[in-house]
Design a protein with these regions (language model features):
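Short linear interaction motifs
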Residues: 281, 489-495, 571-574
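Extracellular disulfide-stabilized recognition modules
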Residues: 488-506
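Peripheral/terminal regions associated with large enzymatic or DNA-binding modules
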Residues: 4-203, 208-489, 608-625
Length: 625
């Protein structure tokens, strides 16, 4: 047809061919070669899974997801379709082409476990997301099923990729659900570390979005985990991410750490998880784990910007449709590029403590304050150490302002419970640094304002460093972080206090009245009682045969000595505060009796509705109504 056509026809055909070749060349430019990305990387293919959820923008704003994507349109060249190194996704029929780093991990024998029950689609989506991770070939991947019988109809063995090993936990215990999950975790840890002899373990729940670069993150943080014996784990999550700067290199360490995306070495397993399957628990494994870490005086490392995020679905573990939660909007890192975290020696406990002290104490006091920082609240309660009042009297907020390079007028120190002042300061453009002096009694009133976790998370020895509305924010616990505070701001434990155990159904107020004599009167002070709301103090006075467990009653801290399921447990709580005039028939309270001369701090614990009902019932039972 070309040869027989006239000149105009031949010209038309030539133009079409030139345009076609030009578009073909433009498309080819989207396809990388080994030379484009260096010899240290390879191109790997994965079957395309439409059910795998798309990563979001990572800024906590779902509306920004589409705007942040780079779209690759076949046969259309565009300046907006620029390639990012190690961040490539090309529409290929039934295939996704991905650049994967072939750099070998430094871990000797690491494992990843996706832990799930019966959500087949969630499990499979998680498996495919994990198998796409850069460097996953150096990990052994497992799926641990807590409800294997419910998934037989889905032919899990045949559906699972050959690179994945299935663990089945067939448990006769079905209720309560949090006990079944706790037992599943213990089973899985035994399998990974005892039977398969792995050196490190990453645990992922089946409803999480994961950052493509998490294995590089773990490879770097594992070195500090293995080096520092005061560290128990690394977490990929941050409960306070809404109040953090989007600094992908910044890491923290703290107690009351996040419980998602936990990474352990063998030391962590031996210290915590090498136990028999529990037959009873008052709460979930995560509360138990944090309590165990607190007993051991150990902490975990976690990022300012999470490397995982909750999905929001009909049957998600934590976040469900229409539940009002904002967890699925938390910022998290979605970039496929590995982040060089740099020198992590600042996370070693001594270095971390020194940095914090340097922010608050002048050079002449640093060593003294650092020594005070090693004094625990237990030491103060038990008389093993005393408050260094002389040093506290020399502490002032002017050094903190100077250290931050701001005027004192640009810093605002807010005392406990002053919610209205906090709201006002957050919107004040002239304020660059906010220090909140807090206690457990008032944490829940400030947490929603600052978009913090409902319970205290991420504190290191009573201090928490954040950024809200472009302002640096420091929270200081007036009991735990006493060594950083001026004397007037410390909540002191009174050395004249007397600790006593109560009889069943005896309140702390009644204990203190019983202890009083004609020459010495004692009272129950709720602010002093909060000091002994901890496992270490319960174990001083009760046998606690089955250890400590978490509860939310306001008769805490208590020992259960009657023939009920919790017999032999010592119970305490980090989420609620104890009351003086509360008691129940099945427990014995641990009480603090103070002299009337004790300093009156005036903190008033939040009283739960259930507590008010129980107090009325107790008065009826005692014939006081």
């Amino acid at each position: 047809l070309f040869m027989k056509g006239d000149t105009l026809w031949k010209l038309f055909v030539c133009v079409v061919c030139v345009l076609a070749i030009s578009q073909y060349i433009s498309l080819c430019k989207l396809v990388p070669t080994a030379d484009d990305h260096g010899k240290g990387e390879e191109i790997r293919y994965y079957p395309y899974q439409e059910s795998i959820p798309l990563d979001s923008a990572g800024r906590g704003d779902e509306s920004a997801v589409e705007a942040s994507k780079v779209h690759y349109i076949p046969f259309e060249s565009s300046k907006t379709s620029e390639l990012k190194k190690q961040s490539l996704e090309i529409p290929v029929v039934n295939k996704v082409k991905e650049i994967v780093s072939s750099s070998k991990t430094s871990l000797p024998n690491p494992a990843i476990v996706i832990i799930g029950c019966s959500r087949y689609s969630n499990i499979m989506n998680s498996v495919h997301a994990v198998l796409k991770l850069k460097g996953v070939e150096y990990y052994r991947v497992y799926v641990s099923l807590g409800c294997p019988a419910q998934l037989k109809q889905n032919f899990m063995q045949s559906a699972m990729p050959k690179e994945v090993t299935i663990l089945e936990f067939n448990d006769s215990v079905t209720e309560p659900p949090f006990l079944k999950i706790f037992r599943h975790y213990v089973f899985m840890f035994h399998k990974i570390f005892d039977e398969y002899k792995h050196s490190h373990l990453l645990v992922l729940e089946d409803d999480l979005l994961i950052s493509p670069s998490i294995l590089s993150f773990l490879d770097q943080t594992s070195r500090i985990l293995d080096k520092d014996p005061s560290l128990l784990c690394v977490s990929l999550f941050n409960d306070n991410a809404f109040a953090e700067p989007f600094d992908v290199k910044l890491l923290h360490r703290g107690s009351q750490f996040p419980n998602l995306g936990l990474f352990f070495n063998r030391r962590g397993y031996e210290l915590v998880w090498n136990i028999s399957l529990p037959n009873f628990t008052t709460t979930g494994w995560d509360h138990w784990f944090r309590m165990r870490a607190e007993e051991l005086h150990m902490e975990c490392v976690f990022p300012a910007v999470p490397r995982i995020r909750h999905q929001k679905g009909l049957i998600g573990t934590t976040v469900k449709i229409n539940d009002g939660s904002q967890l699925h909007l938390m910022p998290y890192l979605t970039s496929e590029e590995d982040v060089d975290l740099g020198d992590l020696s600042y996370l070693v406990q001594d270095a971390y403590d020194r940095w914090i002290v340097s922010q608050f104490a002048p050079a002449t006091l640093e060593e003294t304050v650092l020594r005070n920082m090693q004094i625990t609240v237990d030491d103060l309660i038990e008389g093993k150490a005393r408050y260094d009042v002389k040093t506290a009297e020399k502490m002032s907020w002017s050094h903190l302002a100077s250290k931050k390079g701001i005027w004192e007028s640009e810093m605002k120190v807010i005392s406990y419970g002053n919610v209205y002042s906090l709201i006002s300061v957050l919107s004040n453009k002239n304020v660059k640094l906010i220090v909140v002096l807090m206690t457990n009694e008032y944490y829940k009133t400030i947490a929603p304002i600052l978009k913090l976790a409902n319970s205290p998370r991420g504190f290191h020895k009573g201090s928490l460093f954040l950024r809200v509305n472009g302002k640096e924010l420091i929270l200081l616990d007036r009991r735990e972080a006493w060594f950083l505070l001026p004397e007037k701001d410390i909540v002191f434990y009174d050395p004249a206090n007397v600790i006593r155990t109560a009889a069943p159904d005896e309140s702390c107020q009644e204990v203190c009245e019983r202890l009083s004599t004609t020459t010495q009167r004692y009272v129950c002070d709720m602010n002093q009682l909060q000091f002994v709301n901890r496992c270490t103090q319960l174990k001083r006075f009760f046998p606690c045969e089955r250890g400590c467990a978490h509860e939310v009653g306001q008769d805490l801290p208590v020992y259960v000595n009657t023939t009920i399921k919790t017999q032999g447990y010592c119970l305490y709580s980090t989420d609620v505060q104890p009351l003086c005039d509360y008691a129940v028939t099945v427990t014995q309270r641990l009480c603090v009796c103070s002299t009337p001369q004790v300093r009156n701090y005036g903190f008033k614990p939040l009283v739960l509705r259930e507590t008010n009902l129980e107090l009325l019932n107790r008065k009826r039972r005692k014939g006081l109504l």
